[in-house]
């Protein structure tokens, strides 16, 4: 059985891993998941990520905690396979009045809402992280 929404699965694994105080979570790897992991690491929401395995690559995310509490307070999928959400550069949302980030898939790659605004790009809103 194939997975319907791999990005939602990735976000759920992160949410569940932090709820269970796991050190790391693993999942099947893809280019889009690696790009999202890169953005999460750059923004300080995860400690690190690495890809393991040759035939079936696995993506391992090392989760981040501060004083025993998960750094990611909320992480939610926005655009999904049944309802895609696209926004122009002027319509990009601010998550929690700028305290969180929106992960946006643009023509220049996956980036935060701030980076997309600076580059003058719109795109598909993949998820919100706060």
From Swiss-Prot:
Q: What is the lineage of its organism?
A: Bacteria, Pseudomonadati, Pseudomonadota, Gammaproteobacteria, Enterobacterales
GO cellular-component term (any): ribosome
Role noted for this protein: One of the primary rRNA binding proteins, it binds directly to 16S rRNA central domain where it helps coordinate assembly of the platform of the 30S subunit.
Gene Ontology MF terms in the entry: rRNA binding; structural constituent of ribosome
Name the Gene Ontology biological process terms. translation
What family does the database annotate?
Belongs to the universal ribosomal protein uS8 family.
Could you tell me the superkingdom of the organism this chain comes from?
Bacteria
On assembly, the entry states: Part of the 30S ribosomal subunit. Contacts proteins S5 and S12.
> Which residues, by range, are in coiled-coil regions?
none
Identification of the protein by name = Small ribosomal subunit protein uS8
Report the Pfam families cross-referenced here: Ribosomal_S8
State the organism of origin.
Photorhabdus laumondii subsp. laumondii (strain DSM 15139 / CIP 105565 / TT01)
Q: List the disulfide bonds.
A: none
The keyword Heme appears for this protein: no
Q: Keyword annotations for this protein?
A: Ribonucleoprotein, Ribosomal protein, RNA-binding, rRNA-binding
């Amino acid at each position: 059985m194939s997975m319907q929404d791999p990005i939602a699965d990735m976000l759920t694994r992160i949410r569940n891993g932090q709820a269970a105080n796991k050190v790391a979570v693993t999942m099947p790897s893809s280019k889009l998941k690696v790009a999202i992991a890169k953005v999460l690491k750059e923004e300080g929401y995860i400690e690190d990520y690495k890809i393991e395995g040759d035939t079936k690559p696995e993506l391992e995310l090392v989760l981040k905690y501060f004083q025993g509490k998960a750094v990611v307070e909320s992480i939610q999928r926005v655009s999904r396979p049944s309802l895609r959400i696209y926004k122009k550069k002027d319509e990009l949302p601010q998550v929690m009045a700028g305290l969180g980030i929106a992960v946006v898939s643009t023509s220049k790659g996956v980036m935060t809402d701030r980076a997309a605004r600076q580059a003058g790009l719109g795109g598909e809103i993949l998820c919100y992280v706060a």
